[in-house]
């Protein structure tokens, strides 16, 4: 007959093994996936706030920025998606730099396409 130490060791091993098996099965179960999806759907999406031209935006300034009618939105696809939204004053201040950046990016893509041919 096995000794008391052997029996305790086997009992401890089996309890730990069952714990490990239960943890793995709960991870793979559909209920766990449903709970994860519910948790993700409850999180509100992060909303980005544009920066002011001078200083930081206060709560009263954000409504003015959101209601601005003279906004410009630029989107283009490279190996990744990029979106830029500017108000009229921001476009006048940063328009040349943005145009130069876009020309450089698009020019690199054109040069790479020509080199591949």
Curated annotation (Swiss-Prot):
Prosegment residue ranges: 52-75, 99-117
**Family assignment from sequence similarity:** Belongs to the motilin family.
The name under which this protein is listed is Appetite-regulating hormone
Q: Where in the cell is it found?
A: Secreted
Principal cellular location given in the protein's record? secreted
Which residue intervals make up region (Disordered)? 30-68
* Modification Leucine amide occurs at: 98
Renumbered to this chain, the positions carrying a covalent lipid of the kind O-hexanoyl serine are 26
Here the segments flagged for biased composition (Basic and acidic residues) are 31-43
One annotated GO molecular function: hormone activity
Gene Ontology terms describing biological process: actin polymerization or depolymerization; decidualization; dendrite development; excitatory postsynaptic potential; gastric acid secretion; negative regulation of apoptotic process; negative regulation of circadian sleep/wake cycle, REM sleep; negative regulation of endothelial cell proliferation
**Name of the gene this protein is made from:** GHRL
Q: Where is the lipid attached (O-octanoyl serine)?
A: 26
Q: Where is the signal peptide?
A: 1-23
- Lipid conjugation (O-decanoyl serine) is at 26
Q: Which organism is it from?
A: Canis lupus familiaris
Q: Which domain of life is it from?
A: Eukaryota
Please tell me whether the keyword Transferase is annotated for this protein: no
Q: Which Pfam families match?
A: Motilin_assoc (PF04643), Motilin_ghrelin (PF04644)
Q: Any idea which UniProt keywords this protein has?
A: Amidation, Hormone, Lipoprotein, Secreted, Signal
Question: Posttranslational modification, per the record?
Answer: O-octanoylated by GOAT/MBOAT4. O-octanoylation is essential for ghrelin activity.
Q: Name one GO cellular component term.
A: extracellular region
Biological classification of the source: Eukaryota, Metazoa, Chordata, Craniata, Vertebrata
